[in-house]
Amino acid sequence: MNPHVIITNMKKRYTGVSGTINALMPVQASDLEIGFIGEDLPGAQLAKAQHPENFHYLSVWQAIALSRKKLPNGRCRIWHVRRDPEMMLTIFLRDVLRFPIKLVFTSAAKHRHSWFPRWLISRMDGVIATTPEAASFVPNTTKVVFHGASLDRFTPPENKSTAWQRTGLPGKLGIGLFGRIRPTKGTDIFVDAMIKVLPDFPDFTAIITGQALAAEDNYKHAMDEKIRTAGLADRIVFLGNLAADQIPLWYQNVAIMVACPRYEPFGITPLEAMASGCAVVASRTGAFEYIVQPGQTGELVPTSDVDALAIAVKKLMSDTSTIEQMGRAGRARVTAEFSIEKEAQGIADVYRTVLQA
């Protein structure tokens, strides 16, 4: 066992960063010997099952012990980190303990970092930005690499209407919002838009996935009250936190996927939905303006604009053939431009650049 790259996931809660790592590991392990430390992920288990010779679970102490020496070929080992505490650890190993390692960081934030994260990022050997905007806030960006979606994990069903029927929920087609339940994700914007639209479209039912933490109890309760008052409790349904293996099924179940956050660094859910054959309506934040092609794979609306979201959704609901066409076009776009394999290749390019420096 001598992994060339050590990938860290040192956060207990499953986040968007966790989702990215989860999707990448089985692909990266097909070409690289990887050591993985931190909270376990389904993607790590899959990588271990598919590539047992290339994928290794490590404790932090095992990873540190391995990193005291260079690889047998004389090259430095790479640590790929994505969070501030992970940068702090690896900078200490390299600069204080003088370990022969190279550090790569992925930055998605679309704002100027505070002074301490800026200093941490400045100490990296390589920086991957997930969008050109993210790169504009990180002077030492090595390469822009867009996130990708797994075309194997996220696949379209044969028929969206048939897929919806298996849910047991009312109506003939579904519209969904995926991710955490909180104000920044725009859950309330989605609920308000659905209250405007659903009474005119009895064939549609809305679902909302994701966890509401204790801090969002009042926020969730206010939405529940709005939904009950509107008489739509059976047609705007909170599914709660889904198991990882259930998420692809629910993308298959819905015909339209909405992503309406007030702010998003990148936002992977539209890619997963498009790979699953959904038409997508998204707000103009994150990487959505790069991903969604208005009129072809979905529609884009201003952030925090309930009326604009309602109009865009109503436009799609009025023409199911357009939904189907957009779903096919979305799958084709992810295949051509935003596959997880393309992301993995971009990351591998950065690893090579860092090792050659």
Model-based region annotation:
Residues K315, T322-E337, E343-G346:
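A short, well-ordered alpha-helix in the C-terminal region of glycosyltransferases
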Residues P294-G295, E299-D307, K315-S321:
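Conserved acidic donor-binding segment of nucleotide-sugar-dependent glycosyltransferases
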Residues R262:
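Aromatic "clamp/platform" in nucleotide-sugar-dependent glycosyltransferases that forms part
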Residues A279-S283:
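Short hydrophobic beta-strand element within catalytic cores of glycosyltransferases
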Residues N241-L242, L249-V254:
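Short alpha-helical donor nucleotide-sugar binding micro-motif in glycosyltransferases
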Residues K220-N241:
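Nucleotide-activated donor-binding/catalytic signature segment of Leloir-type glycosyltransferases, i.e.
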Residues I121-K160, L169-P170:
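Donor nucleotide-sugar binding/catalytic pocket of nucleotide-sugar-dependent glycosyltransferases
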